[in-house]
UniProtKB/Swiss-Prot annotation:
Catalytic residues in the record: C379, H515, E517
Anything else known: CTPSs have evolved a hybrid strategy for distinguishing between UTP and CTP. The overlapping regions of the product feedback inhibitory and substrate sites recognize a common feature in both compounds, the triphosphate moiety. To differentiate isosteric substrate and product pyrimidine rings, an additional pocket far from the expected kinase/ligase catalytic site, specifically recognizes the cytosine and ribose portions of the product inhibitor.
UniProt: L-glutamine binding residues: G352, L380, G381, M382, Q383, E403, R470
Source taxonomy: Bacteria, Pseudomonadati, Pseudomonadota, Gammaproteobacteria, Pasteurellales
Protein name (database record): CTP synthase
Amino acid sequence: MATNYIFVTGGVVSSLGKGIAAASLAAILEARGLNVTIMKLDPYINVDPGTMSPTQHGEVFVTQDGAETDLDLGHYERFIRTKMTKRNNFTTGKIYSEVLRKERRGDYLGATIQVIPHITNEIKDRVIAGAQGHDVVIVEVGGTVGDIESLPFLEALRQLAVQVGREHTLFMHLTLVPYIPTAGEVKTKPTQHSVKELLSIGIQPDVLICRSDRMIPPNERAKIALFCNVAERAVISLKDVNSIYQIPALLKSQGLDDFVCERFRLTCPEADLTEWEQVLYKQANPVGEVTIGMVGKYTELPDAYKSVNEALKHAGLTNRLSVSIKYIDSQDVETKGVEVLKGVDGILVPGGFGYRGVEGKIRTAQYARENKIPYLGICLGMQIALIEYARNVAGLTKANSSEFDKDCEQPVVALITEWQDAEGNTEVRTDESDLGGTMRLGAQQCHLVSGSRARELYGKETIEERHRHRYEVNNTLLPQIEKAGLKVTGLSADKKLVEIIEVPNHPWFVACQFHPEFTSTPRDGHPLFAGFVKAAYENHKKSVK
């Protein structure tokens, strides 16, 4: 069967939820038995989001094969079973870098390099490559139609529609249909102008997803269809909802999946959304609630911890609990003391980079350990837990990470480049080296120690989790820390690197070097998060007695 392409664009304003809409449609099509994948084309000049500020761009989502990608790929994996790869996300910067590399290599035989055809051809080639092996590929274009940055992508998709045939392509455009209280009605003019902008570059949308705070009345949908040259049944109303997991059912109720299948002449069974109905039932009927304190340095933008936020909610679903997240700036712990941590049922310290707020995180780990509060540390959250234990229990009073103090006397955490690879080679880095591409990235094996809490939670000896870090636990100083009682319960594939630590004689204190949040989904909560939230609930019940 030929691959079919759905191109998703957005107009009027940004942040309409193109990624959620694309993922929701993909979930319905997958529920009809189709093999679906989703791609994200980002129009910024950065080669990838790896070195971008989390407070500007949100989290960096790491794929199984180690690509540092846009957070929308996290949404995609949470909605569909297909795992994303480095083929599922690319940027303007990556496209231009590749074209310039080919030009320097002489691939273009001295031709003048231009946006059309060289840049657009590179975009088309990557979209086609990413679509291989799938029945349907949904391609989301970042940004807003009318922005100069996205023009090469839109032109490439216009060309691709001609190349593969319009019978195998569908353009889906998200727009804003605002409600004006003084007029007492929704206004369609912004949508009309957004479609006009698309038409000016040669793209006629086939489906319009109309975002609003309410359902669009039938007469307004008919008006939009008439002025925008779209079938009335293809004007879909997408109102604000309490949970993003309601959106697949909302789109299906308006026949979007039927329209898509008819357009592509696909014969497939009705979508079975039973799993999503179960998710929504659990979400609407919790038996209790917990408050998790998330202590980090990017707390002013919750999207910086998007996958962690979602994983906590998924763990709530697994345990039939409502999870409330209290964001705590780690610098507040330094300046105001541990008082800011009181009233939470569990404490989570997520990943991060840089020295700012680190001492606050270390005090947080100490507070959780000494007060028997359930603690989950992720990546840096594991490293600071190790530093805290080394300082306050193992007697290594000057313990630190070489990330925060290059000259520290007791570097219990050290640069990844100080470790030898399988061939005995050590990578050399200087102050001039690029930050990009210097980390342990992607899915890697981990061996769990028998009898440990981690082994009990996972229910198996070997697991695979995703990494994104430069620093490792220093094996030279580790024996002294273990002698003081800290348990190493997870080791890398070669059993040389620490992956999980646990504090004994504590209700629940687990920290991991990897990022478990990247593999959590609403249908399959992650064992570590599920165990953590359950322990937090047990702590909550004690506190209210």
